[in-house]
């Protein structure tokens, strides 16, 4: 009886996820006087560091489109530096110095690994304001931010729990840091809420963006376990392609890929960065 009731709510859960574009962001301010900053006309040049392509149908593209939409609304110019490795402090320094030379007085770093490099750059340029997405360390001119994505993760877990026929659900994750573990926990709690018999199988790639590794890990998961739905925490949508090729459904992340996977993407936890960037810039 209980499972039947949850089955009737399936469409409602999907609709809620579709409407839940994450705009309730967690933002830790390092005592930035934003009103004073906005008096400076140089603010209209904004710099952005991205660790890969802006056309990944995932994490980076979601940020890029958010910045572009915010720029149109605010009339600012966005200066991008792409393919800046987030584990290379010298590359971060060089890209940051280039952005500063172009007149940027706000610089956004959109990958977790930029932390150490951004802190060092901020120490050298106290007049510049830095914003680190998914970061953990602040400074007088460095703030960190992220969103309450665990809310959408929980709902997508409910959708997976209602949809699975095998009671085996996969989750391919990048690395065991707080934001990833929090998402896995929320997703699993959502699954268990509607289907206590279902099991979530987690596999790690130890990388945000390594397509071949993601493909290998996902294929092995689907071969070893009777998984019929796969979720993920990776930068791109590569996993959705693998799931589709192997006859499983996928739960997307970061970006709306319904047009690309109309029959096999069950739902997605999607970012709407425009709202946040429009407010912050």
Task: List PLM regions with ranges.
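A residue-level marker of the well-folded mature domains of exported/periplasmic proteins
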Residues: 3-13, 24-281
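Hydrophobic core of alpha-helical transmembrane segments in multi-pass integral membrane proteins
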Residues: 18-23
């Amino acid at each position: 009886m209980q499972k039947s009731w949850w089955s009737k709510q399936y469409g409602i859960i999907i609709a809620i996820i579709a409407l839940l574009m994450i705009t309730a962001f967690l933002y830790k301010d390092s005592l930035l006087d934003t009103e004073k900053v906005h008096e400076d006309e140089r603010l209209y040049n904004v710099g952005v560091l991205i660790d890969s392509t802006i056309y990944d149908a995932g994490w980076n593209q979601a940020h890029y489109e958010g910045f572009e939409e915010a720029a149109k609304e605010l009339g600012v110019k966005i200066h991008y530096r792409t393919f800046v490795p987030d584990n290379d402090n010298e590359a971060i320094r060089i890209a940051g110095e280039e952005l500063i030379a172009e007149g940027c007085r706000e610089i956004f770093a959109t990958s977790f690994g930029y932390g150490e490099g951004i802190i060092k750059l901020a120490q050298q340029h106290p007049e510049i304001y830095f914003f680190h997405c998914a970061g953990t360390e602040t400074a007088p001119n460095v703030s960190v931010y992220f969103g309450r994505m665990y809310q959408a993760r929980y709902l997508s877990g409910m959708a997976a729990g209602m949809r699975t026929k095998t009671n085996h659900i996969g989750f391919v994750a990048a690395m065991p840091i707080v934001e990833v573990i929090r998402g896995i926990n929320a997703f699993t709690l959502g699954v268990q809420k509607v289907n206590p018999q279902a099991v979530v199988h987690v596999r790690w790639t130890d990388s945000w963006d390594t397509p071949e590794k993601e493909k290998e890990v996902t294929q092995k998961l689907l071969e070893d376990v009777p998984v019929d739905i796969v979720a993920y925490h990776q930068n791109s949508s590569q996993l959705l392609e693998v799931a589709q090729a192997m006859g499983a459904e996928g739960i997307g992340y970061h970006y709306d890929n319904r047009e690309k996977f109309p029959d096999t993407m069950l739902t997605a936890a999607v970012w709407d960065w425009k709202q946040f960037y429009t407010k912050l810039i």
